[in-house]
A protein has these predicted regions:
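Aromatic-lined substrate-binding rim segments of carbohydrate-active enzymes
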Residues: 19-27, 32-101, 132-135, 231-239, ...
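Hydrophobic targeting/anchoring helices
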Residues: 249, 255-433, 527-530, 534-535, ...
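The substrate-binding groove and active-site-proximal loops of carbohydrate-active enzymes
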Residues: 3-14, 36-52, 108-128, 210-226, ...
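A short, well-structured beta->alpha microelement
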Residues: 253-258, 436-457
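A conserved amphipathic helix/loop scaffold
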Residues: 326, 468-717
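Conserved, mostly hydrophobic/aromatic
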Residues: 5, 25, 33, 61, ...
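Short, acidic/polar
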Residues: 12-27, 127-133, 254-266, 326-334, ...
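Polysaccharide-binding and catalytic clefts of secreted carbohydrate-active enzymes
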Residues: 92-272, 276-286
Length: 717
């Protein structure tokens, strides 16, 4: 594990400060400095290259003993290219140049944003030359650590409000992709309910029905993945050294229906995947980290950007933001990442931004480069990693027995149904709520991609799987889950499971096919208990006081309740009036629970009304605890109150590393209990090397946490 920082992005900081600042960075213990190499700046003419500043940076960083993370930015093409090759520019869906481009954006103040359409031959050729020339120049540098081949996947699949470029090359690729997918135009016509004479007639229309919209989303993702493979191929050919890592990262927003990237498809050829983070809610941050870790598919992942100072609130005037990071938060966000298995955390940035709409934000130092309490906190973090390298170099997090299922096409449908019509996205709320609930009681949560589950089954280590939004089916998915349940897994389904078949057509009976066999229920009606009460969005499902749900009382829910007819042997668990809306079926050695209401969504809705804080006594937590017990799952460590924790293991030692997080704005006290200690063990605070006390069988330990702070505890000598 290591900590680094962004340092130079033209024009900040000024050259005369570099030697002083880089020495400062080395003295506080940071290991890696990020350098941006913007295309628009380093190639001012067709055969002109200006690398003097970058050369100097590499020299001074090497003198300071610092490694360099070099950021390639093909998203800012030089202005002479736009003037000479207008055919390479982005276009709207009518084929016209997008107004007011290229421009200087917040993150690319040198201009040239958003770059070129790399579906165009000339755009691709010019960008390849930029990458080859730049990479070849620095591949022999001893202190080159990694190339970031794509910053935050900008411009993603949307730029300036457009789904993708409307140039002839992109539209042609869209039509070729459809032909490869369908083979014959009549096959597409049958599915889309159209009457095209050929694939050449097919336009791109962003507001359309589910089936076409899913194809558009999957083409967008295919195109994004192809662009990533293209970039990686160019960079690796120019720098074949395997110790020079190729990395990339997504942007700092939370996952919602506007999050259009299927991260699992862009990580295949990277050495490390990462994410920025500019969220305040620790639980949202945790969800983004679990997302990033899971999408990395076992590869290293990084917290690639985290604010070192004042943040942004996405308002017009960023400098008015009141989101200034405390010293505690400066430690906590990287420690949150490390507690989710990250191998690196990179501050954005060492010096406050000096130019453009992102100024004067983000610095670990003040605007003059002087140290602050945040630089001291970053130094404490780096020093802890150095002092306890034997612990952190051997830290690992066992695969989680608890997972959420993610079906990208379901959330594409939700994007069309809700977000684009200004409605609350219920599937996203349900996913977020289940994640918040599980995280609050100490579970690590894996995210399983539905395509992986359909193709390869559920990993053996998963014992409890929740599908928060199963509105659309996928071939093989129900069969994979059914086999896993028969083998002893516990599965929780969402309302309207399989409401649409894999083609996007509504199923005549819900749930259909294998889903029906697995869950043992049939939808009889959709109920909307709050439809006539505009003052409330939450209703209650009464739980049947037997077995699994005995003593819990009721569960808050949102939006709708799915009434069921039950097959023989299926046990009712929850009701709304006379209608059964929640059931349990035993299948082989496992259990399948049909939840006909969005319980996770209500949990998330209520937590957001409490500034993100879950209620420790919420009935959903009681239900999840019982489901986990049936699945044979429990966290290694639990914490009381509003603290939540993540626990890792130290290879070959029997020691545990506990990351204890306080997401609240107040100082709190929590009691920690370790579930699997055979004897009493000492507990040490690794940040200050103090002995906190002893914990063991039947013996909990009281720990204090400052507001928004994290403590790192070593359990065991």
């Amino acid at each position: 594990m290591f900590v680094g920082t962004q340092y130079y992005r033209q024009p900040n900081p000024p050259l005369q400060d570099w030697e002083r600042d880089l020495d400062h960075i080395r003295r506080i213990g940071l290991k890696v400095v990020r350098l941006w190499i913007p295309w628009a700046y380093v190639q001012p003419g067709p055969d002109e290259w200006e690398f003097q500043a970058c050369d100097r940076f590499f020299d001074l960083a090497e003198q300071a003993g610092l490694k360099v993370l070099a950021q390639l930015t093909a998203e800012c093409a030089p202005y002479w290219i736009h003037a000479r090759y207008p055919e390479a520019a982005y276009r709207d869906l009518q084929g016209q140049l997008i107004p007011n481009t290229p421009f200087a954006s917040g993150y690319l103040t040198v201009g040239g944003h958003p770059g070129l359409c790399y579906d165009t031959p000339v755009g691709r050729q010019l960008a390849e030359r930029y990458m080859r020339v730049t990479v070849s120049r620095y591949t022999s540098r001893d202190n080159l650590y990694a190339w970031d081949v794509w910053n935050e996947l900008n411009p993603l699949t949307a730029m300036g409000g457009y789904e993708w470029c409307g140039c002839p090359y992109t539209i042609s690729r869209w039509r070729e992709w459809l032909e490869e997918r369908y083979g014959h135009i009549q096959s597409l016509n049958t599915l889309w309910q159209r009457n095209f004479g050929s694939f050449d007639e097919i336009p791109f229309i962003p507001r359309t029905h589910y089936t076409e919209r899913i194809d558009q989303a999957e083409f967008s993702q295919y195109r994004l993945s192809e662009w990533m493979r293209w970039r990686i191929g160019i960079v690796r050919a120019a720098d074949p050294k395997p110790d020079h890592l190729l990395v990339s990262h997504h942007n700092g927003s939370t996952y919602d229906v506007g999050y259009v990237t299927d991260d699992w498809q862009v990580t295949e050829n990277l050495d490390a995947w990462g994410t920025s983070i500019y969220l305040r809610d620790f639980y949202e941050v945790s969800r983004k980290f679990d997302w990033t870790r899971s999408a990395a598919r076992g590869k290293p992942w990084w917290l690639s950007e985290v604010s070192g100072g004042r943040g942004i609130d996405h308002s017009q005037y960023f400098y008015l933001s009141d989101d200034t990071k405390s010293a505690a938060e400066t430690r906590s966000y990287p420690l949150l990442a490390f507690s989710h298995g990250a191998q690196a955390s990179i501050y954005w940035q060492f010096r406050c931004e000096s130019f453009g709409e992102e100024s004067p934000n983000f610095g670990l130092t003040n605007q003059a480069g002087d140290p602050t309490d945040r630089t001291a906190a970053a130094s404490e973090l780096a020093a802890m990693l150095d002092r306890h390298a034997a612990v952190f170099d051997n830290l690992f997090f066992p695969p989680s027995p608890v997972a959420l299922l993610w079906e990208p096409r379901a959330f594409t449908m939700e994007r069309v149904s809700y977000w684009e019509r200004s409605r609350t996205p219920i599937g996203v709320l349900n996913l977020a709520g289940y994640h918040r609930a599980l995280t609050s009681v100490g579970h690590q949560v894996d995210i399983l991609h539905a395509a992986d589950v359909a193709d390869r089954g559920i990993p053996a280590h998963v014992r409890l799987l929740i599908n928060p939004y199963g509105v659309i089916d996928r071939p093989g998915l129900a069969e994979s889950i059914a086999r896993w349940v028969e083998g002893g897994g516990v599965f929780v389904a969402s309302p309207v499971t399989g409401q649409y078949d894999a083609r996007g057509y509504s199923s005549p009976r819900v749930p259909p096919g294998t889903w029906r066999s697995l869950l043992g229920v049939q939808q009889t009606e959709l109920l909307y208990p709050t439809s006539h009460t505009s003052e409330t969005e939450v209703f209650s499902v009464d739980l049947v006081p037997i077995g699994l749900t005995s003593g819990i009382g009721d569960l808050p829910a949102m939006r709708l309740a799915e009434a069921y007819a039950l097959d023989h042997g299926v046990q009712p668990l929850g009701v709304v009036g006379k209608d059964v809306v929640m059931t349990l079926r035993t299948a082989g050695d496992g259990k399948a629970i049909a939840c006909g209401a969005f319980f996770g969504a209500a949990f998330e809705f209520e937590a957001r009304q409490r500034n993100g804080m879950p209620s420790p006594s919420h009935s959903l937590l009681g239900l999840l605890d019982r489901l986990a017990a049936i699945a044979g799952v429990r966290p290694l460590v639990s914490a009381t109150g509003h603290a939540f924790c993540r626990t890792g293991c130290v290879k070959g030692s029997g020691q545990l590393v506990l990351f204890l997080h306080n997401p609240t704005e107040s100082e709190i006290t929590t009691w920690i209990t370790v579930s699997e200690l055979g004897a009493e063990q000492s507990v040490f605070s690794l940040l200050d090397d103090s002995l906190l006390g002893v914990t063991g069988p039947g013996r909990s330990l009281c720990v204090g946490l400052l507001a928004r702070d994290t403590r790192v505890l070593l359990i065991g000598a």
